[in-house]
Design a protein with these regions (language model features):
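Short, polar/flexible loop-turn hinges at active-site or ligand-entry regions and domain interfaces
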Residues: 112-117
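Membrane helical hairpin/interfacial module
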Residues: 90-96, 102-103
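Domain-scale detector for complete catalytic domains at protein termini or as standalone homologs
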Residues: 105-106, 110
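Membrane-interfacial terminal anchoring regions of lipid-handling membrane enzymes
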Residues: 1-70, 77-84, 92-94, 121-122, ...
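ATP-grasp fold ATP-binding core
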Residues: 138-145
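Short helix/loop capping segments that flank catalytic or ligand/cofactor-binding pockets
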Residues: 71-72, 98-99
Length: 403
């Protein structure tokens, strides 16, 4: 996972969608995807669904899986096929870490910022306005982050469903959610690149290379080493058992420690992202109060502990992002490569993983889901699960067609 700043955003970046600019940059956007990410083929299925829903006067929410950092570019190529600009809800950190021109460009292709660690009323108002009034779809990635586990959709966060239900409550037009699956494949044998990355990772962790082992077994050895190091760091000893079990235990230990420090009730729902979000809000409020309020003076030792808490919460989300069973059985080349992509980001601390060869992308849209008005927690939870299952069905359909 990529490191990024957390706190109160320095500003809000509104969308400045410019349809003629989107049309004018089609070739450039496609060439950038080809040149920087070596995506030489993009296939589309069901993209006419978007045009049909827009022509019917409906508000359209697109909910794709977040396969890679540049999947939004592939999604835009799909929308180009039916001449549809798109709006994107984007984490404010993406804007704050971009150049002035990149921010300008993102706004012109429909991006606007959201603070995911708080209740961002400005972003919510903008999203609801788009769904109720604008003639173009809104894209929200309900997974929230890139987890590099395309074949298994990470549990959706509830924000997209809550926004859709809120918009439908007072909308004069029908609002639908269109599930979307996005997947990337290598078009050539990239095992030499995979082996090179494995050797780099093993060297970083002071492991000997075992070329006689399968790639997934070498990755498992890396995982064993990492979890043992982190157990020593946080617990002072190493546990026994499967990596997945030990990861869950370590996550719970870290979260409970921070929740106790900040007097936050321990959630029993097992919803790790929401627990992390609540703790980040608490820590950020204390750190910013020390800066903004003259009568608040947090001792240096406590400031350092708060900063460490933020680091620990980031580490918790890193652990959460590893399924533990993604390479079981006979994993595909793509699954092995995806897992190495994650390890490159987490261990080698690269902003973007290695592009290992020429690739093909597929973007598939599913049957629209009508959004009924209602904002109860049950409605939000039910719609979230429905959207997640519908997106998983698109990924499964992509895989079924390929084999």
């Amino acid at each position: 996972m990529n490191r990024q700043p957390y706190g109160t955003p320095p500003q809000w970046w509104p969308p400045r969608l410019t349809p003629w600019w989107i049309r004018a940059t089609r070739g450039w956007r496609r060439n950038m995807l080809r040149r920087k990410q070596r995506i030489v083929e993009v296939d589309f299925h069901g993209v006419d669904i978007l045009r049909r829903e827009i022509d019917a006067g409906h508000g359209v929410l697109i909910t794709p899986n977040h396969a890679v950092h540049y999947d939004s570019a592939a999604l835009y190529l799909a929308a180009d096929q039916v001449d549809l600009p798109l709006y994107f809800m984007v984490a404010w950190q993406v804007f704050s870490m971009s150049s002035t021109f990149e921010c300008w460009f993102m706004q012109r292709i429909g991006c606007f910022s959201v603070n995911r660690e708080a209740t961002d009323r400005q972003a919510m108002k903008q999203a609801i306005h788009i769904l109720q009034n604008e003639p173009y779809p809104l894209v929200i990635f309900p997974e929230g982050d890139v987890y590099h586990t395309t074949d298994e959709v990470t549990p959706f966060r509830e924000g997209a469903a809550a926004l859709a239900l809120s918009a439908a409550k007072r909308s004069k037009r029908e609002i639908v959610a269109v599930p979307c699956g996005i997947k990337f494949w290598y078009l050539e044998d990239v095992r030499s690149s995979i082996l090179e990355t494995l050797e780099l990772l093993e060297e970083r962790l002071f492991q000997r290379t075992h070329p006689e082992l399968r790639e997934q077994d070498r990755i498992h050895r890396l995982a064993e080493a990492i979890i043992a190091l982190k157990e020593l760091d946080y617990l002072g000893y190493t546990n026994q058992g499967r990596v997945r079990q030990r990861t869950g235990q370590l996550v719970e230990t870290i979260l409970q420690h921070i929740e106790q420090r900040h007097a936050t009730p321990i959630s029993r729902r097992g919803d790790i992202p929401n627990r992390v979000k609540a703790l980040r809000q608490s820590v950020i409020a204390k750190l910013e109060a020390n800066i903004e309020l003259p009568d608040v003076d947090i001792p240096p030792d406590e400031q350092r502990r708060l900063v460490r808490d933020m680091e620990d919460l980031f580490f918790v989300m890193q652990l959460y992002s590893y399924r533990g069973d993604y390479l079981d059985g006979q994993p595909s080349l793509e699954r092995v490569a995806e897992t190495l992509d994650k390890l490159e980001e987490d261990i080698l601390e690269r902003d973007l993983p290695t592009v290992r060869g020429r690739r093909r992308a597929e973007v598939r849209f599913g049957t629209p889901i009508p959004i009924a008005s209602g904002e109860s927690r049950t409605s939000v939870a039910d719609l979230t699960m429905q959207l997640q299952q519908a997106v998983q069905a698109q990924i499964d359909a992509i895989n079924a067609c390929r084999h």
